[in-house]
Amino acid sequence: MPVMASYSTNEFKQGLKVMLDGNPCSIMENEYVKPGKGQAFNRVKLRNLKTGKVLEKTFKSGDSLEAADIVEVEMDYLYNDGELWNFMDPVTFEQIAADKVAMGDAAKWLKDDSNEKCSIMLFNGVPLNVSAPNFVVLKIVETDPGVRGDTSGGGGKPAKLETGAVVRVPLFVQQEDSVRVDTRTGEYLERA
């Protein structure tokens, strides 16, 4: 049986992927606490990568956790079959499918056959999390025409994109325009 790598509490840092109670987790925060009396400990906030739940745990100084066997891969988005989002490795042409939980927010930024490059976190070959590209270009399918001189709403208006996502755009942007959006913030950047 292969020996799994493990991390001691003094190696804990944000972003570290570890196993906790059989589940892959990512460390979000790690605080080293040395009380006046007693043993030092680490107060750790972890996100369960399967469920997305955040938990807080305390570990005695010197405790260790097994490393999670997590791989990040870049894959091209192909299509959604109604239930799963399908991706392909551009080198090996191997395909994988991600469910709604793994897709999270990324789903609203991806359009079928776009071949957008996505970053996918795999645990034992199963997608845990999909990150959309930082920037995407999508067409506006629905927005109100901007009324000249109407700046009461901060100079913006909602626009529905072809994927169903809604972003705020400037008044001069019209239906059928293609726009560049930052997927991390959901903000309009420019007309494309």
Curated annotation (Swiss-Prot):
A GO MF label = translation elongation factor activity
Task: Spell out the InterPro entries in the cross-references.
Answer: Elong-fact-P_C (IPR015365), NA-bd_OB-fold (IPR012340), Rib_uL2_dom2 (IPR014722), Transl_elong_fac_P/YeiP (IPR020599), Transl_elong_KOW-like (IPR013185), Transl_elong_P/YeiP_cen (IPR001059), Transl_elongation_fac_P (IPR011768), Translation_prot_SH3-like_sf (IPR008991)
What residues bear N6-(3,6-diaminohexanoyl)-5-hydroxylysine in this entry?
A: 37
Protein's GO biological process: peptide biosynthetic process
SMART domains associated with the record: EFP, Elong-fact-P_C
Write out the PTM section of this UniProt entry. May be beta-lysylated on the epsilon-amino group of Lys-37 by the combined action of EpmA and EpmB, and then hydroxylated on the C5 position of the same residue by EpmC (if this protein is present). Lysylation is critical for the stimulatory effect of EF-P on peptide-bond formation. The lysylation moiety may extend toward the peptidyltransferase center and stabilize the terminal 3-CCA end of the tRNA. Hydroxylation of the C5 position on Lys-37 may allow additional potential stabilizing hydrogen-bond interactions with the P-tRNA.
Q: Which GO terms describe its cellular component?
A: cytoplasm
- CDD domains noted in UniProt: S1_EF-P_repeat_1 (cd04470), S1_EF-P_repeat_2 (cd05794)
User: Which keywords, in A-to-Z order, does the entry hold?
Assistant: Cytoplasm, Elongation factor, Hydroxylation, Protein biosynthesis
Q: Which residues cross the membrane?
A: none
Q: Which domain of life is it from?
A: Bacteria
Localization terms from the record? Cytoplasm
Pathway where this protein functions: Protein biosynthesis; polypeptide chain elongation
So what family is this one in? Answer: Belongs to the elongation factor P family.
User: What biological function has been recorded for the protein in this entry?
Assistant: Involved in peptide bond synthesis. Alleviates ribosome stalling that occurs when 3 or more consecutive Pro residues or the sequence PPG is present in a protein, possibly by augmenting the peptidyl transferase activity of the ribosome. Modification of Lys-37 is required for alleviation.
Its recorded name reads Elongation factor P
Annotated gene:
efp
